Amino acid sequence: MDKPITLITGTRKGIGKFLAEHYVKQEHLVVGCSRSEIDWSLEGYEHYVADVSDEVAVKRLFAEVRKKYGVLDHLINNAGIASMNHCLLTPLATVHKVLDTNVVGTFLFCREAAKLMQKKHYGRIVNFSSAAVPMKLEGEAIYAASKAAVVLLTQVLARELAEFGITVNVVGPTPLETDLTRSVPKEKMARLLSQQAIARLANFEDVANAIDFFLKRESNFVTGQCIYLGGV
């Protein structure tokens, strides 16, 4: 059986890098991208430099994937940026940057991936939202709005792409164990985690487990769904 082709955005570090390693271990051929070069290598992984919000760069990346592999089985839209500012202190440039990366980038990759997946009449797309949406976190108005847009985008795309055998779902992680969260004062983090049914930070494995479910062939009747982790 041919190895599945899995494309993951935002793989330079963090959860994106973890997912690349995770799916290589599962015998996937993984293609990844980020806005800059990576300082690591992995057998079974191929990296491209691309800004997800740059349509020309995105089309060029997919042309390479089409030329080399001919098909695409999975897309994981991990790339995203956050901005934590009170609305009165948020410059317009930040608004554009967050929306371009989180919403426009997700749309462009979904659109181009679906064109490739059509050929096989099969595909799995997993997008990233955030627990900041249901938790309505203060200081994250633009970030939360962008991630809410990803949920609705996912639900509409699920309907539009169902006839092609493509499912589109979304995972919404709670705060992850990262350098950023470790710098947050303990009292503030405790208040945040107390809003979850399971009051702890998420780890990369938690996110991968949810994505694994969406990618399974047996999940062919699951589409347009959002899984928020931690019971928020």
Regions found by a protein language model. Name each.
Residues 12-13:
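Conserved glycine-rich cofactor-binding loop
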Residues 86-87, 94-99, 181, 192:
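Substrate-binding pocket helix/loop in short-chain dehydrogenase/reductase
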Residues 88, 135-141, 163-164, 199:
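Active-site loop immediately N-terminal to the catalytic Tyr-X3-Lys motif
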Residues 107, 122, 200-229:
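C-terminal substrate-recognition "lid" of short-chain dehydrogenase/reductases
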Residues 110, 146, 154:
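Active-site helix of classical SDR
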Residues 115, 159-163, 220:
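Alpha-helical segment proximal to the catalytic Tyr-Lys
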Residues 130:
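Residue(s) in the substrate-gating loop at a strand-loop-helix junction
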